[in-house]
Regions:
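A glycine-rich, often tryptophan-bearing local segment used as a flexible ligand/cofactor-contacting loop or short
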Residues: 166-303
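Catalytic beta-strand/loop cores that center a nucleophilic Ser/Cys/Thr
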Residues: 118-121, 128, 225, 255-379
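Extracellular/periplasmic catalytic domains that process cell-envelope and extracellular macromolecules
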Residues: 101-104, 145-148, 210-212, 337, ...
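Helical hinge/lid and interdomain linker segments adjacent to catalytic or ligand-binding clefts
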Residues: 19-20, 25-29, 60, 64-69, ...
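Hydrophobic targeting/anchoring helices
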Residues: 17-121, 371
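Alpha-helical scaffolding within the catalytic cores
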Residues: 91-96, 140-142, 351-355
Length: 416
């Protein structure tokens, strides 16, 4: 009998040494590349346990030598776990924590134009630095119905209203602006559409259908509000004649259909081409910014019930609860214009600004994140891209990477 017990103990110990813990608290050397390790494991059909609210949202992975080697190469902190595994599970069970099983590496697409633009894209930077695979799509691929091949779609500094980013006032004579305008017009004509705004609104509806069928959308900066505006206008001409050669619909105010937008309601559209702003959704407004400066601008994350609200809990995993603010063409969202079903996950508690939103539509979801680059407070046209090796523990960039793992989560019944 004693021999059996000893064998059993040895067996249990051997099982319990077959896990690697990737801590995501302040002890982690490179938070951003840690997400890449999780994706690396999923790509090799190895499940990952995401320990929600445990040490900043840590990862638990089977202890394979090649994963250890990859962690060392990428500079990711990891620990081999033995008998402590039971203590970890017990801690999770007794606190506002939970375990989500990640099962399959999501197929990721980034919506980005083929011609180089004079600004960076935070998500492309994050995925590249974290060594996560992605494909770049543009309008042709969307119009040719290839979105269904991807689990997750990202939109960044794009303009779905057909106003070329509302850069007319300062850049309409710039070579990059003229090239972009000509390219967009040629593409619209190729697909039999009379204007760029008509073509962009068609794109927005296809993306909405993609979400409805189970897709995951993540949008930042101007791709958030301009997208919802495009959905709400549909067949209405809401752009100035300098953009399409035709006048704005005289009854545009009464023709906005807020029921067609995803997240926002009761907003006012700014049609003046000289105003660098789409609507009053943006807070603070880009054309009249009221900022406290980089040293004083912060937003806070809400804490959700890990066992009852796993989705917003996943999307807000971090090693700090308060994050540096950052600006963009769309810096944040006016709380008064957010639909009631939308979950606010991050906000400036001292103002009407929401920074980070999540909602469901059909079988899928969307997440909106205000601002352009979490580690560049005011990212201007022509600025060099951010070097993420200098910001490898960025809390703001972590929110982006939470979103790429979200589609990999095993669905489980919601507790009641």
């Amino acid at each position: 009998m004693k021999k059996i017990i000893i064998i059993l103990i040895l067996f249990i110990n051997s099982v319990f040494t077959q896990k690697i813990l990737i801590p995501m608290d302040q002890t982690q050397n490179d938070h951003l590349k840690a997400y890449g390790i999780a994706y690396y494991a999923l790509n090799r059909n190895i499940n990952v346990e995401w320990l929600l609210n445990f040490q900043g949202g840590s990862f638990l992975i089977d202890n394979h030598s090649f994963i250890q080697a990859e962690c060392k190469i990428r500079g990711v902190t990891f620990l081999e776990i033995g008998n402590d595994l039971l203590d970890i599970y017990s801690t999770i069970e007794q606190n506002n924590m939970d375990i989500v099983i990640l099962e399959k590496a999501p197929k990721i697409a980034i919506y980005s134009p083929p011609n180089k633009q004079p600004w960076d894209d935070a998500v492309t930077l994050a995925l590249t630095y974290a060594e996560v695979e992605y494909q770049i799509l543009w309008d042709e691929e969307v119009l040719d119905n290839t979105l269904e091949n991807y689990d997750w779609l990202h939109l960044h500094h794009e303009d779905f209203t057909g106003q070329y980013g509302k850069f007319y006032r300062n850049y309409h004579n710039a070579p990059w602006y003229i090239e972009q305008k000509n390219s967009f017009e040629s593409l619209a004509k190729k697909y039999g559409m009379k204007s760029v705004h008509e073509e962009k609104k068609a794109i927005s509806r296809i993306i909405k259908n993609y979400i409805s069928n189970g897709g995951f959308l993540f949008a930042m900066c101007s791709a958030t509000d301009s997208y919802d505006i495009a959905l709400s206008l549909e067949n209405v001409d809401g752009v100035h004649s300098v953009f399409d050669g035709t006048p704005i619909d005289n009854d545009i105010v009464n023709k906005i259909d807020y029921s067609k937008s995803l997240a926002f309601k009761n907003f006012t559209i700014y049609t003046d081409p000289m105003i660098y702003e789409f609507s009053d959704i943006d807070y603070p407004p880009s054309h009249n910014p009221i900022t406290r400066g980089a040293e004083a601008d912060y937003f806070s994350l809400f804490e959700f019930s890990a066992k009852y609200d796993p989705v917003p809990t996943m999307l807000t995993q971090n090693h700090v609860p308060i994050i540096k603010g950052f600006m963009g063409q769309t810096t944040g969202f006016n709380k008064n214009m957010i639909k009631s079903h939308v979950i606010i996950m991050g906000e400036d508690p001292a103002s009407d600004q929401a920074k980070y939103l999540h909602g469901n539509f059909g079988k899928g979801t969307y997440t909106f994140y205000g601002g352009h680059d979490p580690e560049d407070y005011q990212h201007f046209v022509g600025d060099p891209p951010t070097d993420l090796s200098l910001h490898r523990n960025s809390p703001g960039y972590r929110l982006i990477l939470n979103n790429i793992l979200f589609p990999a989560a095993r669905k489980k019944e919601k507790k009641t």
